[in-house]
Amino acid sequence: MSEFSIAIPTHDRGENGPKWLKELFESLKVQTFQDFDIVISDQSKNDLILDACKEYSDDFEFTYVRYEGDVPCENINVALKECTGKIIKVMFSDDILVAMDALEILHKEYENGCKWAFSGFCGTKDLSLIHI
């Protein structure tokens, strides 16, 4: 069992979906704390997200689930139900971890008795720019 499960509910975002998901994967690859698995609950109707996951299958331990329903919040629940890590971090396909030690910081707090934490974002992303 991993320390962390990274739960990522996804849906159809056209060509941007896999692009943004790969950016998230790249931010996870450089984390100083690497004891995590990734759970993808994919609500899209095509294989673009699945193909992006396959590209990173040598880098990460994945659980991939195709969610056929049409309720976005249930897609999050599907991802959460598949998590096996001691700590669950929900991320969305257009999120990234900016700090390379983000998971390490969360893990240290967990080890110090923290039972619940949340994180925020520092900007928004459009098709060509990151706004901080």
Model-flagged regions — what are they?
Residues 130-132:
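Conserved small/polar residues in nucleotide/adenosyl-binding loops
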Residues 2-7, 37:
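Cell-envelope/extracellular polymer assembly enzymes that use nucleotide-activated donors
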Residues 95-108:
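Acidic donor-binding/catalytic loop of UDP-sugar-dependent glycosyltransferases
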Residues 112-121:
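A short, conserved acidic/glycine-rich loop-to-beta-strand motif
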